[in-house]
Amino acid sequence: MHNIMDNLIGAKECVPMIVVMESGDINRPASKPGDPNPFAGFADYGKTFYEVMIQDLIPMIDKTFRTKTDRDHRAMAGLSWGGRQTMEIVTNNIDKFSYIGDFSGALLLQNLKEDFGGILSRPDEFNRKIHYFFIGYGGAGDFGPSDIKALEGSGIKFDTYESPGTAHEFLTWRRCLRKFVPNLFK
């Protein structure tokens, strides 16, 4: 990732920025061997990452580094389940973020009036508050197309990128990063 960022900054294709990478892979309560429903509690997987991000990580970064702390200068992106975490965190803290990057994210859009607090059913508000919304995915089978289909015609502004010949993998996500970053903080 650092090579991608260094090259983009060096080529003046993006503004210099601080990039923080944290793992939202905070485990869910483990099921017991032989549990008839081993996926019980899966909805809680990574749920405490929200608290870590908002209550601990962002304040520590702002205290430690010379940052611009307003929402216009803060973006969040995530890959796979982290894409869903990104949407949950940003849409519940829209006063802190204005850019969303979803790289093969498991948005699992079902009902725009209910998903993510219903903000996707209010396109005027969403588009006013979110300066850039990016959805990227691997073209050889990945999350993305179903979410894009759910958003089409909704009035939500978003860009998409299909990584050719890749699936749910790091090459997809590196390509997504390369496409997403030049659109930040403009």
Report the location of each language-model feature.
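Non-catalytic cap/lid and distal C-terminal segments of serine-dependent acyl enzymes
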Residues: 1-186
